[in-house]
Amino acid sequence: MDSGLGGLSVLREAIKLMPKEDFIYYGDSLHAPYGVKPQAEIRDLTFAVVEKLLDMGIKGLAVACNTATSAAVRLLRNTYPELPIVGIEPAVKPAVTESHGGRILVMATPMTLKQEKFQNLLAKYREQADIVPVQCDGLMEFVEHGDLDGQELDDYFAEKLSPVLTDDTESIVLGCTHYPFLKKELRHFLGDRDIHLIDGSLGTSRELMRRLKVQGLLRTDCLLYTSPSPRDRTRSR
């Protein structure tokens, strides 16, 4: 689930890792964006979506929204202890692990950056790297509206990133599942700068697969159907 279309970036990786599973995707575009709403409202919206998914018979859940993860995933796990639940968070750890001492920008919604979960990440890794949060209110709407390139998007990147881009900036963490769909235009904006773009879609999908496997829920069977060969038809006469 996600607040809109962004979680499709996680679904894409999950399908690659678990091709034998059946997936249901719920994008709550009616209430998007979550990232500018109060925490209590985000929690209520997330629970409403999860209850719909449970009615559909799901056996596992990926909360493919950084904002919903921060606001609700802990309470979801307490409420549904038997359900494998994974969330997503800005991929700060991989960025720091791969860092060579340069600046790391973290693009995310205002609510994600404000939440305790991100603040704990920041506190944990701030001594190891120069981490700069970049508040990107309004960016996910470009994806929701299908505006994945163009001058308006370039102008947005210029407004948000130009003040914090330095010669030693080495990575940008895409801290919202919508943002990977903007990679091409972001690279166009960055030009010839050698900056690594990092997102958490693959890591979230791997964790979902791991939890399903631990609980014996991962589907590994495969059904094969064939039409009779000419030789088989001859034998049956």
Where are each of the predicted segments found?
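Non-catalytic structural scaffold of enzyme domains
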Residues: 1-227, 231
